[in-house]
């Protein structure tokens, strides 16, 4: 069954309800410029109450490997989601948590870059989002379907792919059936305002996403 990641959480209530509704992963954004930013200390207060079957994911932009490790330890993060193109392959080997590598995909994107990254780092779990200058997730912009097909085709046989960008409770089931991702990621698509989840939309999103079977599991 497809994995569901609810991202950009900043309140205990939203996190607990996401777990009750069936989310598999919860995302906490440590990028200070994001409207969904949460401090490591506040994230830790939420994460320590999560059930053991729900993974915590830290979203990072512009952080060095050592700082990522420190934040993950402080906030009790299971998985580091890395959006930073400046980290080299060697930097990824220094990271202690499990890793999801984010790729912002546009028309000029060379899908072979994903395989090269996997071969250099061993990281085999990815999140694909639509490219938007200076924005890292939560944009509400959908990834072109043809491009999405290409990236998911590229990782067949070695990778697990999450789809993000422009998903909501109305389009997620159709998207999952069409692209068959390992998982889906949503932030702005189920919000009443940045960082505040609309509970009815969140419940419906998770239910609709999980109607379709998908790849069995990495995380």
Curated annotation (Swiss-Prot):
One GO biological process term: L-tryptophan biosynthetic process
Pathways involved: Amino-acid biosynthesis; L-tryptophan biosynthesis; L-tryptophan from chorismate: step 3/5
GO MF entry, a single one: phosphoribosylanthranilate isomerase activity
Record flagged with keyword Transport: no
E.C. designation(s): 5.3.1.24
UniProt keyword terms in alphabetical order: Amino-acid biosynthesis, Aromatic amino acid biosynthesis, Isomerase, Tryptophan biosynthesis
Catalytic activity line of the entry: N-(5-phospho-beta-D-ribosyl)anthranilate = 1-(2-carboxyphenylamino)-1-deoxy-D-ribulose 5-phosphate
Enzyme class: isomerase
HAMAP family: PRAI
Similarity comment: Belongs to the TrpF family.
Protein name: N-(5'-phosphoribosyl)anthranilate isomerase
Species whose genome carries this gene: Chloroherpeton thalassium (strain ATCC 35110 / GB-78)
